[in-house]
UniProtKB/Swiss-Prot annotation:
Family statement drawn from the similarity comment of this UniProt entry: Belongs to the universal ribosomal protein uS9 family.
Keywords attached to this entry: Ribonucleoprotein, Ribosomal protein
Chain's gene name: rpsI
NCBIfam families: PRK00132.1
Organism: Mycolicibacterium smegmatis (strain ATCC 700084 / mc(2)155) (Mycobacterium smegmatis)
SUPFAM superfamilies: Ribosomal protein S5 domain 2-like (SSF54211)
Name of the protein in question: Small ribosomal subunit protein uS9
Length: 150
């Protein structure tokens, strides 16, 4: 027979983490597809200012809102920073992905100990996928015209 030993599972505390003091705004850039986002992270109460609009106003889709807040939730700092962002190019999904990357990069500059958690969650990886170009002789990037044998 095999002996099974019990191990304690260590869980992190549910209370919010202690606030981090930063002396100047943290500025980072995130990119995805054609979108480029420049972010300024300042100590605050969790407000988002995206080109002068709120998060809910700029991204009405709840999936995009969750995607953007994910790095802050991962490191328990949802209500500790105000985020000012300038978004350029692309569509809603590309901009949301670029904003998530920029926020994750800013959080690392604030607290380098958060890097492993953000890296494990995949928030620091720049998504390299982009639209494949259309080729001549084809209708789209890969779609060929109908083939006729005779």
């Amino acid at each position: 027979m095999t002996d099974v030993t019990e191990t304690e599972v260590v869980t992190e505390s549910a209370e919010p983490r202690e606030p981090v003091i930063i002396d100047r705004p943290i500025q980072t850039v995130g990119r995805r597809k054609e979108a480029v986002v420049r972010v300024r992270l300042v100590p605050g109460t969790g407000q988002f200012n995206l080109d002068g609009r709120t998060l809910e106003n700029y991204f009405p889709n709840k999936v995009h809102q969750q995607l953007i807040k994910a790095p802050l939730v991962t490191v328990d700092r949802v209500d500790q920073f105000d985020i000012y962002a300038h978004l350029d190019g692309g569509g809603p999904s590309g901009q949301a992905g670029a904003l998530r990357l920029a926020i994750a990069r800013a959080l690392i500059l604030v607290q380098p100990e958060d890097r492993p958690a953000l890296k494990k969650a995949g928030f620091l990886t720049r998504d390299p996928r982009a639209i494949e170009r259309k080729k001549y002789g084809l209708k789209k990037a890969r779609k060929a015209p109908q083939y006729s044998k005779r």
